[in-house]
């Protein structure tokens, strides 16, 4: 490996020497390859020194950057989990008022060794049910949702917060198209009960992804794009504002309709019924942090065991040693993570997890050994460690169908039924580690310049494109450069905001839509890229994105002010 690095550095130096010889012909006699032995030795020594520096960076920087990302955005270091949308529903006679189920509630399927899914966002459950959903009128410009208040609940107490979240649960291309159509063409949301009618809102709004603020301290909006590539389904929800006005309809109301008016006819391919829409939903992932015991089972073989009833250690994605005695973890687990043995003067310890296809007894084998100049040295059998294991059931979870995740755990909400209303997506290991993490960090440091060059933006998108890296079917190409991005042009501009002149950027992306599942897919991609650009700008700066599609269509997004260091006042 060092020989390859040295050869590369030497080639670069010879290339620079040749360029200098062209500019300074009087030096050409000594700058040519092998033209002068003394110069050749000098270049070899410089190349050797550079190669040593580069090898040191390759060896040490990934560990350092990993620790830095723990503070910047820990979510990017986590595995890509299997994900679904779970719908919660109250039993008809038990819930009298709107109730918020906090993130962390868990659900499972009925298998002998089940997959456990944890909610990643709070979910507000109201004591009403969606009884019907349909498109009204020959022009298909009105969507009507029929709600029934359950049991002894009264409408004023059932309302809860001011926003009703509507999940779009049809086939993904259709759901993305419906999302785009509602966001662009909804002109009013009305509530109708008998002869009484009230206007709740003048539009439908997108539901932002809720992220754990403790995991993200950097403003650059990278994680939403990672989520988009891996599971666009989590964005298929819209919000109907103005819900608290429903209380004015009165406590005696048992049935009401929510009507969404459109200024353009809904395409016939988009189906509206109770199978393509759902209330009271939240994303849930097959990913859990589990306390485990590390028990010796041979000179080099150890077993991870857990006593937590809701989780089994199935596919290990990450292992972090806790209280390891004489060992200290300098980095989170990766396939070649290095630990240090303090008693032996800092000698490296190789820590390797062997992924097991079996889920019997909730165990998985791994190897832990001391590495010296002669190879691995076994640790004593009396070595006992504790670990925190990030585990997922990705291999099994991706085979679950709609409705399979419907069984309770010790952390499931009581007096409610639940089921997954969308298919379960695939899961995979962490996207970033080693050189990939170093490259991502480098592009973050570049900021806006890394986002306004076609090659650089394409590479950043490819780094976030987990399905392409994992080789999943129907992934957007590819893992090295984002192929659908065909061109990029930019133009500086300015606008007046109050009494301030704000500089900005008009950015146009030429996009090949063949790799996108639908027009709504393209629309969502542009929204997230626009947010990414804004997150690299200061609050007094702005960006406006335009997508140029192959069929000549243009999608123009609203001007966004920068969110770097906080939102614009």
Sequence positions of predicted segments:
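Short amphipathic beta-strand/extended segments with alternating polar/hydrophobic composition
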Residues: 102, 115-121, 198-204, 399-403
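Extracellular ectodomain segments of secreted/surface proteins
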Residues: 50-58, 75, 130-161, 273-323, ...
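Mixed-charge (acidic/basic) macromolecular-recognition segments
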Residues: 1-22, 27, 203-251, 257, ...
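C-terminal domain/tail detector
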Residues: 329-569
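Extended assembly-interface regions of large multimeric machines
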Residues: 1-194
């Amino acid at each position: 490996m060092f020989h390859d690095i040295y050869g590369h550095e030497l080639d670069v130096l010879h290339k620079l020497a040749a360029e200098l010889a062209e500019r300074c012909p009087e030096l050409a006699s000594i700058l040519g390859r092998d033209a002068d032995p003394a110069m050749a030795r000098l270049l070899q020594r410089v190349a050797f020194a550079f190669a040593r520096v580069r090898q040191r960076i390759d060896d040490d920087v990934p560990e350092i950057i990993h620790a830095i990302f723990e503070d910047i955005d820990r979510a990017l270091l986590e595995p890509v989990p299997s994900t679904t949308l779970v719908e919660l529903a109250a039993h008809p006679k038990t819930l009298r008022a709107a109730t918020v189920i906090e993130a962390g509630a868990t659900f499972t399927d009925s298998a002998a060794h089940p997959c456990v899914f944890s909610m990643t966002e709070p979910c507000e459950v109201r004591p009403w049910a969606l009884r019907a959903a349909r498109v009204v009128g020959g022009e298909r410009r009105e969507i009507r949702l029929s709600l029934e208040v359950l049991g002894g609940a009264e409408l004023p107490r059932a309302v809860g917060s001011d926003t009703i979240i509507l999940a779009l649960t049809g086939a993904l291309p259709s759901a993305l198209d419906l999302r785009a159509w509602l966001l662009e063409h909804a002109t009013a949301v009305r509530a109708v009960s008998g002869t009484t009618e009230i206007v709740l809102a003048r539009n439908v709004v997108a539901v932002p992804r809720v992220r754990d603020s403790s995991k993200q301290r950097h403003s650059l909006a990278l994680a939403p794009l990672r989520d988009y590539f891996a599971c666009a389904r989590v964005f298929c929800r819209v919000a109907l504002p103005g819900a608290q006005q429903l209380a004015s309809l009165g406590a005696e109301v048992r049935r009401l309709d929510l009507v969404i008016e459109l200024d353009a006819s809904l395409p016939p391919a988009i189906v509206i019924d109770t199978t393509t829409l759902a209330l009271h939903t939240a994303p849930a992932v097959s990913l859990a942090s589990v306390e485990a015991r590390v028990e010796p089972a041979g000179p080099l073989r150890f077993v991870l065991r857990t006593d937590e009833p809701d989780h089994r250690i199935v596919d290990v994605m990450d292992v972090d040693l806790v209280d390891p005695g004489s060992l200290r973890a300098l980095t989170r687990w990766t396939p070649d993570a290095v630990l240090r043995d303090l008693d032996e003067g800092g000698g490296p310890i190789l820590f390797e997890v062997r992924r097991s296809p079996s889920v019997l007894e909730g165990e998985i084998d791994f190897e832990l050994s001391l590495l010296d100049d002669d190879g691995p040295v076994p640790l004593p059998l009396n070595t006992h460690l504790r670990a925190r294991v990030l585990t997922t059931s990705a291999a099994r979870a991706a085979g679950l169908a709609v409705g399979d995740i419907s069984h309770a755990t010790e952390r499931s909400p009581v007096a409610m039924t639940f089921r997954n209303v969308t298919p379960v997506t695939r899961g995979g290991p962490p996207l970033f580690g080693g050189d990939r993490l170093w490259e991502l960090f480098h592009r973050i440091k570049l900021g806006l310049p890394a986002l306004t060059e076609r090659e650089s933006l394409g590479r950043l998108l490819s780094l976030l494109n987990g399905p392409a890296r994992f080789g999943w079917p129907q992934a957007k190409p590819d893992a090295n450069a984002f192929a659908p991005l065909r061109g990029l042009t930019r133009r500086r501009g300015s606008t007046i905001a109050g009494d301030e002149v704000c500089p900005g950027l008009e950015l146009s992306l030429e996009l090949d839509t063949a790799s996108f599942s639908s027009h709504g897919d393209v629309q969502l991609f542009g929204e997230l890229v626009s947010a990414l650009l804004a997150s690299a700008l200061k609050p007094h700066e702005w960006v406006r994105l335009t997508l140029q599609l192959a069929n000549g269509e243009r999608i123009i997004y609203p001007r966004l002010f920068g969110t770097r260091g906080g939102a614009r006042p």
